[in-house]
Design a protein with these regions (language model features):
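Compositionally biased, low-complexity flexible segments
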Residues: 1-24
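N-terminal nucleotide/polyanion-binding subdomain common to many enzyme families
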Residues: 25-104
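Hydrophobic/aromatic beta-strand patches that form the interior of the parallel beta-sheet core
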Residues: 34-36, 64-66, 110-112, 135-137, ...
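Short, solvent-exposed amphipathic alpha-helical segments in soluble enzyme
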Residues: 50-54, 127-131, 152-153
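Short glycine-enriched loops at secondary-structure junctions
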Residues: 68-71, 141-145
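S-adenosyl-L-methionine/SAH cofactor-binding core of RNA-modifying enzymes
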Residues: 92-141
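Structured adenosyl-cofactor binding patch, chiefly the S-adenosyl-L-methionine
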Residues: 145, 149-196
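Long, charged alpha-helical interface segments
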Residues: 199-202
Length: 202
């Protein structure tokens, strides 16, 4: 018994039907990255360069930069305030973060706060996140982010090292690069990523 019109249905799942010429499987739907920041322009050159730029142009990855100031309710779109519970310095208010994440719809992946006090980012995190359909990165600035963002919004809190940055944007670039290069088809073949030193246990 044939199929109408002589067409046969491919029995493989739709997500894995297509092969790249290099032999690596790819997922037709792009992996979505949301980056919440008060400095979206900090990512301009990085998003257009190297592997990430190619992955975006090839439809493999979609990166959306969300301007946190757009969700500020203050007259001058301010996003900083004194720390909740007291303390020195200024921190980013929690409300714009909550509103911005809510505007993205129901989360389909981890919501990661990039913070100096977070757990150290490791290759295992990049591998785990490369399997997600979506990843949301929250970039702090000033002294820090209001603690309520870490307690009630982020699913994870990570740092890229024991040093101080002026904001979470450089850390977000590190995470994006580490995750995107692991996506099937981005490097051209699986051996390119599986031959990395961390895969080899070094």
């Amino acid at each position: 018994g044939g199929h109408p019109g002589g067409a046969r249905r491919d029995p493989r799942p739709r997500r894995t039907r297509a092969l790249r010429s290099q032999g690596a499987w790819y997922l037709p739907a792009p992996v979505r990255f949301h980056v919440l920041t008060i400095f979206p322009e900090a990512f301009d050159s990085f998003l257009g360069a190297s592997l990430l730029g190619k992955a975006i142009k090839g439809g493999r990855v979609r990166v959306e930069r969300v301007q946190i100031r757009d969700f500020s309710t203050s007259r001058h779109r301010t996003t900083d305030d004194a720390p909740y519970g007291g303390g020195a310095g200024m921190v980013l208010k929690p409300e714009p973060f909550f509103e911005a994440v809510e505007s993205l719809g129901p989360p389909a992946g981890p919501v990661v706060l990039l913070s100096a006090r977070g757990r150290r980012f490791a290759h295992a995190d990049a591998v785990r996140w490369s399997l997600a359909r979506e990843l949301t990165l929250l970039c702090g600035h000033y002294k820090d982010v209001d603690q309520r963002v870490a307690d009630h919004l982020a699913t994870e809190e990570l740092s890229i090292g024991d040093f101080v940055l002026s904001g979470g944007e450089p850390a977000a670039i590190v995470v994006l690069d580490a995750v995107v290069r692991l996506l099937p088809g981005v490097l051209g073949d699986h051996e390119s990523a599986s031959g990395d030193s961390f895969y080899e246990g070094l």
